Amino acid sequence: MSVSTHHHHVVLFPFMSKGHIIPLLQFGRLLLRHHRKEPTITVTVFTTPKNQPFISDFLSDTPEIKVISLPFPENITGIPPGVENTEKLPSMSLFVPFTRATKLLQPFFEETLKTLPKVSFMVSDGFLWWTSESAAKFNIPRFVSYGMNSYSAAVSISVFKHELFTEPESKSDTEPVTVPDFPWIKVKKCDFDHGTTEPEESGAALELSMDQIKSTTTSHGFLVNSFYELESAFVDYNNNSGDKPKSWCVGPLCLTDPPKQGSAKPAWIHWLDQKREEGRPVLYVAFGTQAEISNKQLMELAFGLEDSKVNFLWVTRKDVEEIIGEGFNDRIRESGMIVRDWVDQWEILSHESVKGFLSHCGWNSAQESICVGVPLLAWPMMAEQPLNAKMVVEEIKVGVRVETEDGSVKGFVTREELSGKIKELMEGETGKTARKNVKEYSKMAKAALVEGTGSSWKNLDMILKELCKSRDSNGASE
């Protein structure tokens, strides 16, 4: 059923990081799918020149989505020339100045908005806080997207509302504390990313966070890449506590990707096919594009994988044998494959031989694993990943947690810990329970986006009816 007979225009502006770009592009696909019977929506994506090739390639199946590049600012202190996304930053310590620099896009963004058809609503990343100012100038309702789930948001809100960790000396970084609004959940101070340790940089990070919070509270709502059935108590908490903008679950957005066409199989798929034929389950190992793992820790991971005797496919940008020394590749030749190229993670997780995923628990990766029914071995490293891991392991029980020696998030993980937890996930009773649970959540995930009846589909319906009708009544152009 069509929301309106008028033609509507939606603007998407993702942050310059693949983990943030992809979900918003998938949301653009979902918008068009929602209106495929009677195309009454157009979608425009804003980005910068160095990010446009990736976006255009990702959307090659969806030429209806228009992509506009804005010139990325030059001569930013500490940022190498030509760096336009966080994956290319020499260090994540440059994240705050990089994010601050995006505000220099604002005048170009607003000049371009003047030339476009009337915008029905905008979805922009929370790190692009300044887009709320642009939205207000043009009287455009703005939704904010942070790329996190409702669980992490709700727990964070409760912790900061009750000021659990405001006094530096009040709790050690690793002392468990009960979350007042969720008494079954215990968190540690180190579960919350405090930015950097340098005072000036911490101050800059705090200032950026305050700007984000201010812009978020003036937004029309949150778009959450999740589904209600996965975390209903936390969605309800977020929508019932105070005057914050309403959050809307519209995922899992990874399920909007089109089926792969018959292109040539890469070597890693041939290897997985072989393992399937041999009846050998495979552990997929990947930590995203921004995890900073020391060579010492990488060596320990390699030895832990080797000791576990489990078959594994490990995707890493580093030359493992160069770090560990000659002989490692020969020793794991039958059981392991190391890939240093870009891979299609969804295709790997969907492969019948893959029975576990050792992950940093970035939300995109965790949710993909849930959607295909693969349990997780959670090893969080930064940002809200510790909360994602807590949700995966303790709340919905679809995974096992890797523990550091000192109990902190960024502490060292031994080969014995890794080997033991790998075997527990792949062969143990906890792994069997996680595998059973994740299969059930996988079914729920697919049901959430069923046309007409899914919870996320209905949420999108409500958003479009509310915003598009209200823009019609205010004289929005067709």
Curated annotation (Swiss-Prot):
Q: Name one GO molecular function term.
A: UDP-glycosyltransferase activity
Could you tell me which Pfam families the record lists for this protein? UDPGT
Q: Where does UDP-alpha-D-glucose bind?
A: 289, 343-345, 360-368, 382-385
Recite the UniProt keywords alphabetically.
Glycosyltransferase, Transferase
Give the family, as the similarity comment puts it.
Belongs to the UDP-glycosyltransferase family.
Q: Which PANTHER family match?
A: GLYCOSYLTRANSFERASE, UDP-GLYCOSYLTRANSFERASE 90A1
Task: Report the protein name in the record.
Answer: UDP-glycosyltransferase 90A1
